[in-house]
Swiss-Prot record:
Signal peptide residues on this chain, from the entry's feature table: none
Function field: This protein binds to 23S rRNA in the presence of protein L20.
Family: Belongs to the bacterial ribosomal protein bL21 family.
GO BP annotation list: translation
Keyword field: Ribonucleoprotein, Ribosomal protein, RNA-binding, rRNA-binding
Designated gene of the protein: rplU
Subunit description: Part of the 50S ribosomal subunit. Contacts protein L20.
Cellular component, GO, one term: ribonucleoprotein complex
Molecular functions (GO terms): rRNA binding; structural constituent of ribosome
Protein name per Swiss-Prot or TrEMBL: Large ribosomal subunit protein bL21
């Protein structure tokens, strides 16, 4: 059984027991999170597709960790001007473990 849900403007395909990295959620470690915007649920041959969401379906997860991703560097380089600008960025994320899919 797996489901596709939306969080942080992105869609994620998950099954029970899977650990997923999402955009930062304002939840503490150990808290339970419910995602109601489930777009599709597949259970063997039974497929439920939402228009736009599946009514009554939700994905339940537990927050495992909060953290920051790898650093990316942004460089603006102007040739022949002896000028460059460098900036770094680390995106916050939340790791959740999927504990249940209810359809």
């Amino acid at each position: 059984m797996y489901a596709v849900f939306q969080s942080g403007g992105k869609q994620h395909r998950v099954s029970e027991g899977q650990v997923v990295r999402l955009e930062k959620l304002e939840k503490a470690t150990g808290e339970t999170v419910e995602f109601d915007s489930v777009l599709m649920v597949v259970n063997g041959e039974d497929v439920k597709i939402g228009a736009p969401v599946v009514t009554g379906a939700k994905v339940v997860a537990e927050v495992v960790a909060q953290g920051r991703g790898d650093k990316i560097k942004i460089v603006k380089f102007r040739r022949r001007k002896h000028s460059r600008k460098q900036q770094g960025h680390r995106q916050w994320f939340t790791e959740v473990k999927i504990t249940g899919i209810q359809a």
